[in-house]
């Protein structure tokens, strides 16, 4: 890789992109407005960080709800087991739990983000605390840099890794979608995912967690989802891994 990329976003995807590029011997700049990298990563899995899943490529694809084949090339090159090897090489011992879910042995998401940040520093990735505003291109459409709120950063390639719109408090504000649209990319309508469900009559059961239970979701009388796992009652309905995967 001869191009010197700038990565926009210091979450899990941005840090991984910067590490992979830097390991190929190129100078990398990473832009992140938050004071700490991996802010959303640190709260995943109830603070434990569900790193990946220990299933093979075909099984992973079979469990993607929509258009799983789109991920075939990526998973073929770097699947869940490759992810496990990557983190264990960075000094994060892992364990496999029910459902083949993979967590750090310490049960601390911070250990995962800290390992990524250490690797960034070892590879001398330039970390810049700034919020990207837009990707700069010339009259031919070639990338020339990134305009930030504080400065402008020349770049021969840009990786948009800003996250979605799921948690504004962590920096996932949808800015990456806006920048992608400015570059001519098509942004499809976004809908919620990994969310709890509202249900009547659950308030009295708030806090009760059940394991090894079945869940079936109906829409207009038609069954649209069924699975088996762990469920948590809340004051407004149900949550937990079983529900969030629905």
Task: Give, region by region, the residue ranges found by the protein language model.
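Short linear loop/turn motifs
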Residues: 97-105, 192-198
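Glycine-rich FAD pyrophosphate-binding loop
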Residues: 22-46
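Conserved dinucleotide-binding and phosphotransfer motif residues
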Residues: 24-26, 90, 123, 183
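Phosphate-coordination loops involved in phosphoryl transfer and adenosine-cofactor binding
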Residues: 2-4, 97, 155
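N-terminal Rossmann-like FAD-binding beta1-loop-alpha1 element of flavoenzymes
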Residues: 3-30
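Predominantly flavin-linked oxidoreductase catalytic cores and closely associated redox partners
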Residues: 110-111, 115-246
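Flexible, glycine/proline-enriched loop segments at strand-loop-helix junctions
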Residues: 71-74, 102-107, 162-170
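Glycine-rich active-site loop/strand segments that organize a redox cofactor
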Residues: 48-96
């Amino acid at each position: 890789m001869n191009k010197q990329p700038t990565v926009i976003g210091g979450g899990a995807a941005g840090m991984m992109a910067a590490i992979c590029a830097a390991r190929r011997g190129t100078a990398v700049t990473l832009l992140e407005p938050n004071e700490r990298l991996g802010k959303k990563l640190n709260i995943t899995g109830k603070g434990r960080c569900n790193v990946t899943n220990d299933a093979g490529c075909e099984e992973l694809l079979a469990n993607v709800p929509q258009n799983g084949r789109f991920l075939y090339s990526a998973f073929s090159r770097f699947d869940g087991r490759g992810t496990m090897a990557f983190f264990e090489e960075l000094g994060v011992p892992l364990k496999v739990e029910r459902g083949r879910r993979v967590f750090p042995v310490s049960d601390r998401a911070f250990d995962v983000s800290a390992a990524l940040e250490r690797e960034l520093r070892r590879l001398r990735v330039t970390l810049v605390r700034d919020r990207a505003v837009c990707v700069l291109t010339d009259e031919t459409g070639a990338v020339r840099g990134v305009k930030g709120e504080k400065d402008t950063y020349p770049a021969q390639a840009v990786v948009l890794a800003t996250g979605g719109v799921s948690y504004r408090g962590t920096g996932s504000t949808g800015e990456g979608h806006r920048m992608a649209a400015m570059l001519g990319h098509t942004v499809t309508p976004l809908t919620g995912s990994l969310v709890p469900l509202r249900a009547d009559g659950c308030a009295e059961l708030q806090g009760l967690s059940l394991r090894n239970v079945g869940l079936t979701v109906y829409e207009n009388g038609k069954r649209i989802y069924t699975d088996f796992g762990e469920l948590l009652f809340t004051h407004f309905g149900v949550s937990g891994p079983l529900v969030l995967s629905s």
